[in-house]
Structure formats: C-alpha cells, structure tokens
Curated annotation (Swiss-Prot):
GO terms for biological process: DNA-templated transcription; viral transcription. Pfam families: RNA_pol_L_2. The keyword Transcription applies. This is DNA-directed RNA polymerase RPB3-11 homolog. Its main location: host cell. Induction: Expressed in the early phase of the viral replicative cycle. It is found in: Host cytoplasm; Virion. One of its GO terms (cellular component) is DNA-directed RNA polymerase complex. Component of the DNA-directed RNA polymerase (RNAP) that catalyzes the transcription in the cytoplasm of viral DNA into RNA using the four ribonucleoside triphosphates as substrates.
C-alpha cells in the first residue's frame, strides 16, 4: 500500500506581541511578556488511498473517543458555607473549571480555589487563581492562567477544595475532547464555485461522496492545549495513539469469531438457504465509528455481498453487525477476517507514516 499520510501542516496559535494593544492587555491582566506555556494548535492533514470511513473514524477517535483529562470538583469540594457570593452557583463554576483545556499526565494532582474580593469593584476569577495543594511539584504548567472561572462582588469570597484531574472520553463529556473543530473534505470530487447557489444549497460537491468513493481527503482539527516546546512531539503522539486505539478495537472483534464453530452469545451464524449464510456479531461498548469502518471495508472486500449493516443499541451499550453473503459459514468468516486485516494494515501504515512525516 502506498503512503497514506501525504502532508501535514501544524500551526500553533501564538500571541501577537507586535500589536501594542495585545501586548499591553497581556501584561496588564496576566503579567505576560512572553507566550503562554500551552497553545492551541491547528493541524491540517492530507490522506490519499483510503476510504471516507477511515478518515471519519480517525476524526471521531481524535475528537471524542480517545482518553483525555479534565479538571473536576469532588463531591463536597464546593464550600457553600464558606463562600459568601451566592450568585456563583456550583454548576456554573463547575462547568467553567471542567472546560479549562489541560495537558495532564499525572492524575494525583489536586488544586484549590480560595478567592476573596477586598476591592470595591467586581473581581474576575481566572484559572491562574487555582493553587496546587497535592501531588508532585509541577515542572511545567498543565493549564494556562487566562481562563475566566467566575466573578466576585466586593467583599465576597469563593472557596473550592479538591479540584482533581479526571480521566474520560469526549463522547461521555465534551470537556474530555482531545481535539476540537474537527472537519474533513474530499479533494478528488469536483466542487461548485463558492459564489454559486448550488454551493450554498447543497454540500458544495457536484457529486455525492456517498456514491463517488473519494480517496483523497483533507482533515483539519485543533488541539486546544499543547506544550509550546513540544508541539510536534505531542501532535505525533496524539495521532499514533488514535491509530493504536482503532487497531485495538478492531482486534477485539477478532476474538469473537476465532472459535466460530463453538456456541457463543456474541456470534450467531446460520444458513438462510443452501447458498447464503447470515452472521450476527454483537460487539460490546462499540460505536458508529467502528461500525461504519467495518461496513465500508467489508463492502470493498466483497463487492457482490448481499447485505452488510450495523446498528448501535444505546441502552445496551453495544453495536450489532449483520452480514449476509452467498458463502459457507467458513468462507464468510474468512472474508470477514480479510476485511479486519485490511483495516488493521491501513492504520498500521498510517501510524508509520506519522513517524516519517512529523519529526
């Protein structure tokens, strides 16, 4: 297979200190005379030779299906009895703290917020006001000091203890999203000029991506908190981790049909007639990301297949894949294995390309 990862543009969002207004504001508000320790990084990547489903899968995993961290308040951490500003409700403050972008590797860190407004004006509480109260001493900040958390009226106070680092994935809570603003387009489908009505009324493409089978794609996204000295290293790690997660999730499906001749609840195989076989595979804790990827790859590997489809069952937290094909049970499992191996190979090559392209 040829090189999949064709090109990448990594562009950090830096403060423009050449602008006097921005320079003065940064110094006045945050005593900043140099760049923030963490920066948002826009990444644009070009891929060639893979399906729309593969790019969509990578996009989904990078955004909300890869483990990441957020700040949260432990039960009882919001000290209502010690806080005198009743307008700053717990849920309001919790949401603001949750959505502070962080770059964390140590879950033992604990922070606190102990703020008192002794002035005659409304005081803005920033993330810089969070103080570390537990865990190893930080060599490098895990969040920027510039995010607004709340406001204090004159003479009022706000006390929060036990602000800890929580691990999760974005599809459970948006604050865990590793990447934001993900979007992708197809470079090998002719588009309408942007000034034409057709561009605004439809998708912008002259042919649907569902029928044209595009193989050249551009994926864009933003990582909101990346250490300034290690931008390329962090981006490379994120992309490789996403590939490994997809490979791992696909490999877990292999275990379901390894012993297909033995009865098991996750796999139902039976003959519809003398020629066709139907397979129903139940995959726990799986999403549309893998379902769409499997469906597309199976179609590509078996163009004359009778049917392949999937359904996510949210209340059971499972995905059900259904395949009908004119083949014996053994042959159907063999074809499924070839499709699985094709997906694994694609993302193994992509992971290798990431190392080659991002130094």
């Amino acid at each position: 297979m040829e090189k999949i990862f064709q090109n990448v543009e990594i562009k950090p969002f830096l403060i423009d200190f050449s602008n006097p207004f921005i320079k003065n504001a940064a110094k006045r508000l945050f005593q900043l005379e140099e760049q923030l320790p963490l920066v948002p990084v826009n990444v644009v990547m070009d891929f060639k030779g893979i399906s729309r489903a593969a790019v969509h899968g990578l996009s989904r995993v990078l955004q909300d299906e890869i483990p990441n961290y957020m700040l949260d308040i432990k039960p009882g951490g919001y000290k209502i009895e010690d806080s005198t500003d009743l307008f700053m409700t717990e849920q309001f403050i919790r949401n603001r703290i949750n959505f502070i972008p962080i770059y964390a590797k140590n879950e033992t860190l604990v922070f606190a917020l102990r703020s008192l407004n002794n002035s005659c004006e409304v005081k803005t509480i920033y993330s810089r006001d969070l103080i570390q109260v537990a865990g190893p001493k930080l060599k490098y900040p895990i969040f920027n000091p510039t995010f607004e958390i709340g406001f204090l009226q004159p003479g009022k106070s706000l006390i929060i203890e036990d602000i800890y680092i929580k691990k999760g994935i974005g599809r459970k809570h948006a604050a865990f999203n590793l990447a934001v603003k993900t979007h992708f387009s197809h470079l090998d489908i002719e588009q309408y000029p942007t000034d034409k009505k057709e561009y605004m009324a439809l998708s912008g493409y002259k042919q649907s991506s569902m029928t044209s089978d595009p193989r050249h794609h551009r994926l864009g996204l933003c990582f909101p908190a990346v250490p300034l000295p290690h931008i390329n290293q962090a981006v490379r790690t994120y992309l490789k981790n996403a590939c490994r997660i997809i490979i791992g999730r696909i490999q877990s499906i292999q275990k379901i049909y390894e012993n297909f001749e033995e009865p098991q609840p996750e796999l139902v195989l039976f003959s519809l007639d003398e020629e066709k076989t139907k397979a129903i595979i139940t995959i726990k804790d799986e999403t549309h990301t893998i379902g769409n990827l499997l469906k597309t790859c199976i179609y590509e590997m078996i163009p004359d297949i009778s049917f392949v489809g999937y359904q996510c069952v949210p209340h059971k937290q499972e995905m059900v894949l259904t395949i009908i094909h004119k083949a014996s049970q053994e042959d159907l499992i063999t074809l499924l294995e070839k499709s699985i191996q094709n997906i694994i190979q694609t993302f193994q090559i992509l992971e290798k390309n990431v190392d080659e392209l991002i130094a």
